[in-house]
Regions:
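Extended, charge-rich low-complexity interaction segments
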Residues: 192-205, 331-348
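Phosphate/pyrophosphate-binding loops at sites that engage ATP/ADP/AMP, CoA/4′-phosphopantetheine
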Residues: 63-76, 229, 268-285
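Glycine-rich phosphate-binding loops at beta-strand->alpha-helix junctions
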Residues: 259, 281-311, 317
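Small-residue (GG/TT-enriched) beta-loop-alpha framework at ligand/catalytic clefts
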Residues: 11-19, 23-36, 79, 134-236
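Conserved phosphate-binding/catalytic loops in two-lobed NTP-binding clefts
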Residues: 300-339
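Active-site neighborhood for divalent-cation/phosphate handling
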Residues: 76, 80-179, 285, 315-322, ...
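Non-catalytic, solvent-exposed interaction/assembly segments
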Residues: 1-108, 150-152, 184
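Adenine-nucleotide phosphate-binding core of ATP-dependent small-molecule kinases
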Residues: 236-285, 292
Length: 348
């Protein structure tokens, strides 16, 4: 089982806060990807937090039902792990032959992960020579608490499935969203239900990985309280009208003003941190995904606040889909970044 490296024939599973996404692709990076099978099933947000036997059984039934609905036959599965359950960082070690670098990281891992290595599952990939210092090599290091990883493994394999990879969600989502071959750096943002994942890519590799507390649910709570409306109405207002100041008399925008200011400040801090670390390298664009990929006018707001060109990304950019598939996916397409990225692992 691997946290980071490539695998063979499989399907991908992303267990979100309020839905599960499942996808199987054919093809590869060089020739392109083709969507073969997929499923999207809404779930109660309380279910993913329910660790009781009943809760586990119910979630398992939903996963198996989604697999059957999608027509997926393989039992091999790659599973995403939420950023809050993992630790991912870019570290630097003295440059040396790859075998020596591997040994250095392996024997000194306890210096880099925020938990005892005896209690953690640690994996890493050598990114190459640091763009900032040719005497250093950069390493993508990822770790997860053993208890959580083993619990997830047991729950999935109890369904008769074979877990061949577990991967931090931020690493998965950039595989689907990052532009290829650009000369500058790009920040990829996935606004989820309860948190926001942020990755800065440079030279086709992650160089900064972090998670920002707060997601769509925090936006909804603010609008619900400010406008004195029901939760479902607040959610609808945000997703339908977004930050348009000519809709609902700009009440949604005004209600979210302080929350958005703090959100944009976190993005600006990340841009500055990256540009201070990599002297002379600019973050040339921000790509939005998840709910930030569909909230009207949020891209314009972020661009105004950060001074960085911002677009709403398309996680399907490298995947061929039929018109019928596209029609079925339309309402939820932006939520598939992690699942697609997981499914695009095979030729990594």
């Amino acid at each position: 089982m691997s946290l980071l490296h490539g695998v063979g024939d499989f399907f991908a599973l992303d267990i979100g806060t309020n839905s599960i996404r499942m996808i199987q692709l054919s093809g590869n990076v060089e020739k392109g990807w083709v969507l073969e099978k997929f499923a999207y099933v809404p779930i109660d947000s309380k279910l993913t937090q329910d660790d009781s036997e009943t809760g586990r059984r119910r979630l398992g039934e939903i996963i198996l039902g989604a697999r059957q609905q999608a027509g997926i036959r393989t039992k091999n599965i790659a599973v995403g792990m939420p950023a809050r359950k993992t630790y991912t960082a870019i570290i630097e070690v003295p440059n040396a032959p790859k075998r020596e670098i591997v040994n250095t990281v392996k024997y000194e891992a306890d210096q880099y992960v925020p938990m005892s290595v005896d209690d953690a599952k640690v994996d890493f990939a050598v990114l190459g020579i640091s763009p900032n210092d040719t005497k250093k090599a950069e390493i993508l290091l990822s770790s997860v608490d053993n208890a959580y990883a083993e619990s997830l493994l047991e729950r999935i394999e109890a369904l008769g499935l074979n877990v061949i990879a577990q991967e931090p969600e931020p690493i998965s989502m950039v595989r689907a969203l990052a532009p290829v071959g650009v000369q500058d750096a790009r920040m990829i943002i996935d606004l989820g239900e309860t948190s926001t994942d942020l990755v800065v890519m440079y030279q086709d590799s992650p160089r900064l990985v972090r998670s920002i507390p707060g997601g769509l649910a925090s936006f909804v709570k603010v609008v619900e309280s400010s406008l004195k409306v029901r939760e479902d109405q607040a959610r609808q207002f945000i997703l339908k009208f977004g930050l348009a100041q000519d809709k609902l008399e700009g009440k949604v925008y005004n209600a979210l003003s302080s929350t958005l200011e703090n959100f944009a400040l976190e993005l600006t801090k990340s841009v500055r941190f990256f540009q201070n670390r990599y002297a002379g390298v600019q973050v040339g664009g921000i790509v939005l995904s998840g709910f930030s990929g569909i909230i009207p006018f949020i891209a314009e707001y972020i661009e105004m606040k950060t001074g960085v060109a911002t677009i709403q990304g398309n996680p399907w950019q490298y995947v061929k889909v039929t018109p019928q598939q596209q029609q079925l996916l339309l309402p939820v397409a932006s939520e598939f970044a992690v699942a697609i990225g997981l499914a695009e692992r095979s030729n990594d």
